[in-house]
Regions:
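Small/polar-rich, solvent-exposed N-terminal microdomains that initiate assembly or binding
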Residues: 1-62, 158, 162-164
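Hydrophobic beta-strand residues in large extracellular and virion-surface proteins
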Residues: 11, 15, 22, 41, ...
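Short structured motifs
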Residues: 26-27, 65-66, 117-122
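Generic structural motif
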Residues: 44-46, 85-89, 121, 139-145, ...
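C-terminal basic regulatory modules in eukaryotic proteins
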Residues: 60, 64-80, 157-164
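Oligomerization/assembly interface segments of phage tail-like spikes and tubes
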Residues: 70-90, 129-142
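Acidic-leaning, charged glycine-interspersed low-complexity segments
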Residues: 92-149
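Protruding loop/beta-arch "assembly-hinge" segments enriched in small, turn-prone residues
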Residues: 144-164
């Protein structure tokens, strides 16, 4: 799974866990079907850099198998975009309050949050709903390991998220 998709999936899961209907893209044809706030989540501008020397962070021993693995990491800077829509302005505001709590304190440890900004609530003619847009500046940390013997690499995974 690519890094931007992992960030988006983590944010979607956190918002859903807090009771907000959340999806990757807002389905305009279903806009009126939601009784409360619904969030569309995206990952905006992103840039990356290595963590450690050429991504290398050192060796670790697997506590179960005692196999030594090399650990690599990378860091991605980006913007998480959230668009909240609701039939009522009050629902949009409540959704924004809940989303703020989640975005600033309920994401996996691999997503380090920065500044969160929200636009004012406005009326969106195309959907006939109230809309509030937010942007969260963040950096995300990804880790991968390789077995020293085989040199095989696993995919980079967002720190703090269980692998499937």
């Amino acid at each position: 799974m690519k890094e931007l998709s992992q960030i988006r999936k983590a944010v979607l899961g956190a918002l859903r866990g807090a009771g907000i209907a959340a999806m990757e893209a807002f389905p305009a044809e279903q806009a009126m079907a939601y009784s409360g706030a619904v969030a569309a989540v995206g990952v905006g501008a992103a840039s990356g850099k290595t963590a450690g020397f050429c991504h290398y962070l050192g060796e670790m021993r697997d506590p179960e198998t005692q196999v030594i693995r090399e650990r690599y990491g990378k860091e991605l800077f980006g913007q998480i975009t959230v668009e909240l829509r609701a039939n009522r302005a009050a629902d949009c505001e409540r959704g924004c309050e809940t989303a703020t709590e989640v975005l600033l304190g309920g994401l996996p440890e691999g997503i380090r949050t920065g500044e969160l900004t929200w636009e004012a609530i406005c009326w969106e003619k195309t959907t006939g709903m109230f809309l509030r847009r937010g942007v969260l500046e963040c950096r995300a940390l990804f880790l991968t390991e390789s077995a020293v013997e085989s040199g095989e690499f696993l995919d980079f995974r967002l720190k703090g998220v269980m692998s499937e």
